[in-house]
Curated annotation (Swiss-Prot):
Forms an efflux pump with AaeA. Could function as a metabolic relief valve, allowing to eliminate certain compounds when they accumulate to high levels in the cell. It comes from the Bacteria. Belongs to the aromatic acid exporter ArAE (TC 2.A.85) family. One of its GO terms (molecular function) is transmembrane transporter activity. This is p-hydroxybenzoic acid efflux pump subunit AaeB. One of its GO terms (cellular component) is plasma membrane. The chain crosses the membrane at residues 13-33, 38-58, 69-89, 93-113, 121-141, 152-172, 370-390, 407-427, 431-451, 459-479, 482-502. It is a multi-pass membrane protein. Its main location: membrane.
């Protein structure tokens, strides 16, 4: 396919984007808005953003959800801007500096919350800055400007949603159904690999792929939830399926690890049974029926606990899968499964990374302020806005540098494109609303195609072009003002890119160590006799951390294996029959405090000291278990955990 070719699957979204732009333009001028440009720009960004992220037409609900986040972010930013202006209107410089800190603060929060919701906080940061900068000539018009900006943005969002609904958005339900079938087959094949106990690298690749696919399925669940309320029952089932899928991975990998020391636990009966190849979900269904008969025949005591738990989880997975596909009413058996343990939310391991993002955004905005005041350039304010936009939106993404480059390319492409519209097209079409709409529809159509291809600079070009062409009411054509706006965008993006390069993010190793220590804490905290604590479901949170670790350190198998071993230890200790008495309960609390100190320690020396203390406490704990005559189901996992921590103590404590 050539660079300028148009694929059939890209046409529908391109028409959808063009329609959103035209609707926003028409409504903006019809209601005599002062700057319809904001409505058009909002419609374009809300519609095109999910398409750029997805690399194609977004699924149903994605545009609505992004629009909802944009409304929330805009209102938070407007309120913050009004508060800052009211409090500091007599000190303009201090007011702008506080706005720069506010933008950094919002970026810091956006780095800690769920990535789907980070967009709202990034938007809140630069919206306040836009308001403060824009009202500098006439500060008394602040409330009016804030209300107008909110109105224009809401109109743009409504137009984007209307265009999305008009062109029948894609439903993700069929993709979810197919993935559920395929994932079950992959889970069975992973168990086959683990029972064969073959090449470790093949097993590592298999479970790593399954972790990614399970995480992707969770993302599909979020999309399905946004799509329509009629999928509420399917959404509940999918949430439980996420935990079941992670349980299947854990039990399979534990089966593999057990055979490193005690291969005799997996009898020939089960080895022969799992030799039968499977290709479809129907094959897995038949095998599971046979496997349940085998377990009923051999008895629970003669069945390895990992295989028994795996079969139970796979059976529940199958039951819920059928319910998701049919979307029927939840029956009593399913309700019992869905009334599972409450999920635990863990503290973010990226606090240092979030602080780096805070300083990047704050310093770049302050640098823009100094540049504006030093040069006295009329478009210095425009440069500041672009700095805030780039840093606020780029920081949460995996590669902020490439996002900044995308904006630079986009603003450079917007200069000749905007020049064509400013000098030729708009002056010749402003007398006809139809021609003006057609001209912008053409722009939206072709850039909509490029956005779906994720062409470098396409998203930035779309937003920057709309931002600099004259879409005000009434239209005025001042070439110097156009040129200043275009150059201001470019300078702002370059300054933001410079700050991103200068303020290096060296938090990766620290984040990795914090993640590993959080796995240790989870394993230690599983040693408890508290009934409520034992019922807590840590598995989704632990695998979410593992997924983050895999993204931060691609290809680092020792780290992945260590993390997975800690997850397995947590699950085994959580179900272990620990003797209930006050002596052990008090020692459990002491070990949790020590493990927490390991995570929160700010220096390597303190971390090593607390980690050494934790190892000593584990030795004492093993002695206590012997005194209280704990069964092997307790002593063996604790012994394995202590051995793992001794083996990897340098990786868990050194920066």
């Amino acid at each position: 396919m050539g660079i300028f070719s148009i694929a059939n699957q890209h046409i529908r979204f391109a028409v959808k984007l063009a329609t959103a732009i035209v609707l926003a333009l028409f409504v903006g001028f019809h209601f005599q808005l002062e700057t319809p440009r904001w409505a058009v720009l909002t419609a374009a960004i809300v519609a095109a953003g999910p398409a750029f992220a997805a690399g194609g037409e977004p699924y149903s609900g994605a545009i609505r959800y992004r629009g909802f986040l944009r409304i929330i972010g805009t209102f938070i930013g407007c309120i913050a801007g009004l508060v800052i202006i009211i409090a500091m209107i007599r000190a303009p410089l201090l007011m702008i500096l506080v706005c720069c800190i506010w933008a950094g603060f919002c970026t810091w929060i956006s780095s800690l919350v769920r990535i789907e919701n980070s967009y709202a906080w990034g938007l809140a940061g630069y919206t306040a800055l836009i308001i403060v900068i824009t009202i500098q000539p006439e500060p008394l018009l602040t409330p009016q400007f804030a209300v107008e900006r909110c109105s224009e943005i809401v109109i743009g969002i409504v137009c984007a949603i209307m265009a999305d609904l008009l062109f029948s958005p894609r439903s993700i339900k069929q993709e979810v159904d197919r993935e559920l079938e395929s994932l079950l087959v992959a889970q069975y094949q992973l168990m086959q690999l683990c029972i064969k106990h073959g090449d470790g690298e093949v097993v590592d690749k298999a479970w790593g792929d399954l972790v990614r696919r399970t995480t992707a399925l969770q993302g599909m669940r979020s999309n399905l939830n946004m799509e329509s309320s009629r999928w509420a029952r399917a959404n509940r089932r999918l949430k439980a399926i996420n935990t079941l899928s992670l349980t299947l991975i854990t039990q399979s990998c534990e089966t593999y690890l057990i055979q490193n020391t005690r291969p005799e636990l997996i009898t020939d009966t089960f080895r022969e049974f799992f030799d039968t190849p499977v290709e479809t979900a129907q094959d897995v269904h038949k095998q599971l029926k046979r496997l349940r008969r085998v377990i009923a025949w051999t008895g629970e005591r003669e069945t390895p606990v990992t295989i028994y738990s795996w079969v139970a989880a796979a059976t529940r997975y199958q039951l819920l899968k059928r319910g998701v596909i049919s979307n029927t009413k939840i029956n009593a058996t399913e309700e019992e499964i869905l009334q599972g343990e409450p999920e635990v939310k863990v503290e973010s391991a990226e606090r240092h990374h979030a602080m780096v993002n805070f300083w990047r955004t704050t310093l770049s905005c302050i640098l823009g302020t100094l540049f504006w005041l030093w040069t006295g350039w009329t478009s210095g304010s425009g440069a500041m806005v672009m700095i805030a936009v780039v840093t606020s939106l780029a920081m949460r993404l995996p590669n902020p540098r490439m996002v900044a480059i995308d904006f630079i390319y986009g603003t450079l492409a917007a200069l000749p494109l905007g020049l064509l519209y400013f000098l030729v097209i708009i002056p010749n079409t402003q007398q006809s609303m139809l021609l003006l709409c057609i001209s912008l529809a053409v722009l939206g159509f072709f850039l909509g195609i490029e956005v779906q291809k994720r062409r470098l600079g396409s998203m930035g070009a779309l937003a920057s072009t709309i931002n600099i062409i004259v879409l005000d009411n009434p239209m005025t054509f001042h070439f110097s003002q156009f040129l200043d706006s275009a150059l201001g965008q470019i300078v702002g993006c370059v300054l933001a890119f410079t700050v991103i390069l200068l303020v290096r993010d060296k938090s990766r190793d620290r984040t990795g160590r914090v993640l590993l220590n959080q796995f240790v804490f989870a394993a230690v905290s599983a040693m408890t006799t508290n009934v409520a604590r034992r019922k807590e479901n840590h598995l989704p949170a632990l695998y979410q951390q593992l997924f983050l670790l895999m993204n931060k350190f691609p290809g680092d198998l020792p780290k992945f294996r260590l993390a997975l071993t800690m997850i397995i230890a947590h699950q085994r200790l959580r179900d272990a029959p620990i003797p209930v008495n006050e002596d052990l309960s008090a020692f459990h609390r002491q070990m949790r405090r020590t493990a927490d100190h390991v995570i929160s320690a700010r220096s390597d020396d303190k971390r090593r000291r607390y980690f050494g203390q934790l190892l000593e406490e584990l030795e004492i704990y093993q002695e206590k278990l012997r005194i209280w005559q704990a069964p092997p189901q307790v002593t063996e996992p604790v012994h394995r955990l202590a051995g793992m921590l001794h083996k990897y103590q340098h990786a868990l404590t050194d920066s």
